UniProtKB/Swiss-Prot annotation:
InterPro entries: Ribosomal_bL27, Ribosomal_bL27_CS. Keywords: Ribonucleoprotein, Ribosomal protein. Belongs to the bacterial ribosomal protein bL27 family. It holds the Pfam family Ribosomal_L27. This is Large ribosomal subunit protein bL27. One of its GO terms (biological process) is translation. GO terms for cellular component: cytosolic large ribosomal subunit. The keyword Magnesium does not apply.
Length: 84
């Protein structure tokens, strides 16, 4: 006969898959049109010049150029400065 009653099932043991968010191209880097610059949840960083925003708030380059971050009115922006 068992000396102890059976314990209840553990209520831990679950975890969500990683989402790989964050800045993908940093300031000064050369990018091509369509390159993903930032993956984020919500508008942590806003799109600036030559930058588009996807349905899931992903920021991507619209033109080739150099990545530049800036802060205006308390908001962070990412821009792509075209090289011509």
């Amino acid at each position: 006969m068992a000396h102890k009653k059976s314990g209840g099932a553990s209520r831990n043991g679950r975890d969500s898959n990683p989402k790989y968010l964050g800045v993908k191209r940093f300031e000064g880097q050369l990018v091509e049109a369509g390159n993903i610059l930032v993956r984020q949840r919500g508008t942590k960083i806003y799109p600036g010049m030559n930058v588009g925003m996807g349905r899931d708030f992903t920021l991507y380059a619209l033109q080739p150029g150099i990545v530049k971050f800036s802060i205006k009115h308390g908001k962070k922006y990412v821009n792509v400065l075209s090289i011509q």
